[in-house]
Amino acid sequence: MRVNPYLSFPGTCREAFTFYATVLNGKLSDMLTHDGMPSGMDVPEGWGRKILHAQLVVGDTVIMGSDTPPPHYVTPAGFWVSISIDTPAAADKVFAALSDGGTIFMPIEETFWAVRFGMTIDRFATPWMVNCEKVG
């Protein structure tokens, strides 16, 4: 079994996933648009080039997402996408990038369980936890 996060966006999925691919050193494996749907399916006006389904491979994890047209889009709440990073320097770098233009919920710092841990909500409204565990 595998559990994968699926993120929703109000029309910014392409920008968000392109950004995440760069920050997380991932590979975009799918980026399907609404205008690629079979004929006869309803596509909201102006949403043809918006993302119907995206997949980003990061290590052995797949993050999926799409643009969700109004009134169905809901701002993310009640969860965090958690990233485990091997080195404090890499954790700081990823946290800084995800925080740029967003809101820092908990600054990245040493905690009793981690060399580095921080929580931020990025400029796309996705909540992230960045963690670099203590060894030993």
Predicted regions and their residues:
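Vicinal oxygen chelate
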Residues: 3, 29-32, 43, 50, ...
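Core segments of cupin and vicinal oxygen chelate
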Residues: 7-60
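Short, acidic (Asp/Glu-rich) active-site segment that either coordinates a divalent metal cofactor
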Residues: 79
